[in-house]
UniProtKB/Swiss-Prot annotation:
The keyword ATP-binding appears for this protein: no
PROSITE patterns, per database record: TRANSALDOLASE_1 (PS01054), TRANSALDOLASE_2 (PS00958)
Name of protein: Fructose-6-phosphate aldolase
Organism: Salmonella typhimurium (strain LT2 / SGSC1412 / ATCC 700720)
InterPro entries: Aldolase_TIM (IPR013785), F6P_aldolase (IPR023001), TAL/FSA (IPR001585), Transaldolase_3B/F6P_aldolase (IPR004731), Transaldolase_AS (IPR018225), TSA/FSA_arc/bac (IPR033919)
Entry keyword Cytoplasm: yes
EC identifiers of the protein: 4.1.2.-
Length: 220
């Protein structure tokens, strides 16, 4: 299983990388824009934060296949081994096919249906990123879509994997893992929600109080 953080906040990546067993960091144009840093400045800093073994994801901006391929090559030259995120449009599918031949690893992003995700996988994307909460927000069933996509990939594109994205709650992320997803990416607020459990703090405080009442201190 691969766990990623969905952010370009270098300080938060450094903080959470000490706690979470993260495999790397995913970004998108909106996330990079929010950082107020040039993508060419922030990507090396993120790579340094996750270490040489961590995997970094960044997205192209062009709308046509030729431009996507050119941008993907620039990203790969800047950060060797980076996974290039390509929106799963008609032009995006063409770009994914071309990049597969070039040996550049891709992720099919902005996936709103299982069929769309399957096409990305068949085109050669190693990862496929369904937008769970955004599907829910449009009146769909994000978890069911992920379940369908996971089954399709297992049957027809076993070399590709679902990297589920767009979460508002830890429950959504867990449901994707229960559906068999091998990878998820968490926004910072959802990652923090997983850590903040009031009942745990209450239990620890009770342990400490009982120990102190018995022994007068909190030492072993």
């Amino acid at each position: 299983m691969e766990l990623y953080l969905d952010t370009a906040n270098v300080a938060e990546v450094e903080r959470l990388a000490r706690i979470f067993p993260i495999a790397g960091v995913t970004t998108n144009p909106s996330i990079v824009a929010a950082s107020k840093e040039s993508i060419w400045d922030v990507l090396p800093r993120l790579q340094n934060a996750i270490g040489e073994e961590g995997t970094l994801f960044a997205q192209t901006m062009s709308r046509d296949a030729k431009g996507m391929v050119e941008e993907a090559k620039r990203l790969n030259n800047a950060i060797p081994g980076i996974v290039v995120k390509i929106p799963v449009t008609a032009e995006g599918l063409a770009a994914i096919k071309l990049l597969k031949k070039e040996g550049i690893v891709t992720l099919g992003t902005a996936v709103y249906s299982a069929s769309q995700g399957l096409l990305a996988a068949l085109a050669g994307a190693k990862y496929v990123a369904p937008y769970v909460n955004r599907v829910d927000a449009q009146g769909g069933d994000g978890i069911r879509m992920v379940q369908e996509l996971q089954t399709l990939l297992e049957h027809h594109a076993p070399d590709s994997m679902v990297l589920a994205a767009s979460f508002k709650t830890p429950r959504q992320a867990l449901d994707c893992l229960l559906a068999g997803c091998q990878a998820i990416t968490l926004p910072l607020d959802v990652a923090q929600q997983m850590l903040n459990t009031p009942a745990v703090e209450s239990a620890i405080e009770k342990f400490e109080q009982d120990w102190k009442n018995a022994f007068g201190n909190l030492n072993l």
